[in-house]
Regions:
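Basic DNA-binding region of bZIP-type proteins
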Residues: 95-125
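Positively charged, structured surface patches that bind polyanionic biopolymers
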Residues: 1-103
């Protein structure tokens, strides 16, 4: 799998109070589907941020057959995204966090690959 086609979706994501509030107010499947769609969209963008100008949001809504007002509500009402109104860009702290961990893992793997592969496991000595 290519590196640019992956990110971790944590099992306890549904335990987040903001996610739970969004699902309660907007309907669980619909709200969670749009949230994950936005995460996937951000994952493909440089620095994991995208435009929240009206035209790109309308295009996104049309592509995924979702109401543009629902996208706007999820972006702005549930503290799941950081929206920079001045730059008209948005990002997801969740995605930033999981990608930081994943990118660090990739960096370590690349360094180990240059050294000849996986680091050797240290043998535990038997305690006497």
């Amino acid at each position: 799998m290519k590196k640019d086609q992956y990110f971790n979706l944590e099992v306890n994501l549904l335990n987040d109070d903001n996610i739970a509030g969004m699902m309660l107010e907007l309907g669980a499947a619909n709200a969670l589907g749009v949230y994950v769609m936005l995460l996937l969209h951000l994952r493909t963008k440089e620095n994991y941020e995208a435009s929240c100008r009206p035209l790109p949001l309308k295009a996104l809504a049309k592509r995924y057959d979702v109401d543009v007002d629902l996208i706007g509500r999820i972006l702005r009402e549930f503290d799941l995204f950081e929206v920079d109104e001045e730059r008209q860009m948005f990002r997801a702290p969740y995605l930033d966090r999981v990608m930081k961990t994943l990118e660090e893992k990739w960096r370590i793997n690349a360094e180990n690959g240059k050294k000849g592969g996986r680091p050797r496991k240290t043998k535990k000595r038997a305690e006497t």
